[in-house]
Regions:
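Enzyme catalytic cores with a strong preference for nitrogen-chemistry domains
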Residues: 1-198, 214-220, 250
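Alpha-helix capping and helix-loop boundary segments enriched in small/acidic/polar residues
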Residues: 54, 85, 89, 114, ...
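A glycine-rich phosphate-binding loop feature that marks nucleotide/adenosyl-phosphate handling sites
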Residues: 192-205, 258-259, 307-309, 356-358
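Short, hinge-like loop/turn segments at secondary-structure boundaries
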Residues: 4-6, 92-94, 123-126, 239-242, ...
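Short acidic (Asp/Glu) and glycine-rich catalytic loops that position anionic groups and cofactors
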Residues: 76-77, 157-161, 217-222, 242-244, ...
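A conserved beta-strand->alpha-helix junction
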Residues: 138-150, 220-225, 233-278, 284, ...
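Active-site adenylate/phosphate-handling loop in enzymes that bind or generate adenylated species
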Residues: 18-22, 27-39, 45-46, 68-70, ...
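ATP-dependent adenylation/pyrophosphate-handling site
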Residues: 75, 193-199, 203-240
């Protein structure tokens, strides 16, 4: 079962098993869990509290059954992953459920990254009239304190209200924060000492470097520029400028010898053939080999820089620019990359990404 335990003063008082198991999107709970069938209520300091877990709240039957059995307030425990506009959907749902059943709801959500999922927090408390009376900030661990009491005249549960709500995040701001949290927790949970970013002088690697610094701190980010004979002077200048503005370790490692060595090795087998993308891909694979060698030697995670648009059409080199352990921009379209880069630049008096890169 997907369950919650009720514990008071060190004593286990009971369990609630989730009733509605989602099987859509990133969820596949019916494969792993059995379905719960019973409503669970418990009394605490004169309040009768009903429990729900995540999807239970998105279906009407569980909360209706709790209300009919005498619940005066609902606590809903959630591991609801981030997606754009999801917080507005949650708020609309909570207001609808609270007003329809005339019952306050405490909505607690997980925060942090887990592999390729990000949980954005934003826990809330809604009164029986559907008003949000307490709200936690997004993407941060936070504790809300709410006082619930019986009103002698109406018999309803009255909730205390916070004085100031957290600032709402724009869509681009919440997306950026999700990328930062996702990378931070993946690296920390995996035990890596830091991350390696292969810079090209382009916008994808520039944005990835910013996210890495914001997630881990400049002292744990290592930028490597690996030029070849076709690399422009502008690309070299822009990569160096960004690394210096973000105060990260910056190394230039030319790949000419590695590429020519591989071409020389392949020359007998490539005789009587015409040069094509095969030779071009050797450059990307030489860069991937260098980054992975640095990763093995120093214990840093290689983060790749391909965006969702490139992944969708296969615009990448297998064992080349795809070589790495985590792709920060894998769910970000190229158009969003530009928007995110401009957003990050607006956070600083001096843009950290050179304007001509954008």
């Amino acid at each position: 079962f997907n369950s919650v335990a009720i514990i008071h003063n060190g004593q286990q008082k009971g369990f609630y098993h989730k009733q509605c198991l989602p099987n859509y999107g990133v969820f596949d709970e019916r494969r792993y869990f059995n379905t719960g069938h019973n409503q669970v209520l418990f009394d605490y300091q004169g309040l009768t509290i009903g429990l729900l877990i995540c999807e239970d709240l998105w279906q009407d039957a569980p909360i209706r059954a709790l209300k009919e059995k005498g619940a005066e307030i609902i606590i809903s425990l959630n591991a609801s992953p981030f997606e754009q506009n999801k917080q507005e959907q949650r708020k609309a749902l909570l207001k609808s459920r609270a007003t329809e059943h005339n019952i306050p709801i405490v909505y607690a959500n997980s925060v942090g990254g887990q592999d390729d999922l990000v949980f954005d927090g934003g826990s809330m408390v809604v009164n029986a009239q559907g008003k949000i009376v307490q709200e936690a900030p997004r993407f941060l661990q936070h504790t809300l304190y709410v006082v619930a009491r019986h009103d002698a005249q109406s018999g309803q549960v009255i909730l205390s209200e916070q004085r100031k709500s957290p600032l709402a995040l724009s869509q681009i701001a919440e997306t950026y924060q999700a990328l930062v949290v996702g990378l931070r927790d993946y690296v920390n949970h995996s035990g890596f000492k830091g991350v390696l970013v292969g810079l090209s002088g382009g916008i994808d690697s520039a944005l990835t470097l910013c996210i890495a610094v914001d997630a881990l701190g400049a002292d744990k980010v290592y930028a490597v520029m690996m030029p070849y004979e076709y690399t422009s002077q502008i690309s070299l200048q822009d990569a160096q400028a960004q690394a210096h503005r973000l105060n990260v370790s910056y190394t230039v490692c030319p790949i000419h010898a590695a590429v020519e060595g591989m071409r020389h090795t392949l020359e007998p087998m490539f005789s009587n053939t015409t040069a094509d993308t095969t030779e071009e891909n050797i450059q990307a694979r030489a860069r991937g080999m260098i980054l992975m060698a640095l990763s093995n030697k120093f214990g840093h995670l290689v983060i790749t820089t391909g965006n969702k648009s490139e992944m969708a059409v296969g615009y990448a080199t297998l064992y080349g620019d795809m070589a790495g352990g985590f792709d920060v921009l894998k769910d970000v379209y190229k158009t969003q990359v530009y928007a995110l880069a401009n957003y990050r630049n607006r956070l600083e008096e001096t843009p950290v990404i050179p304007e001509r890169v954008i």
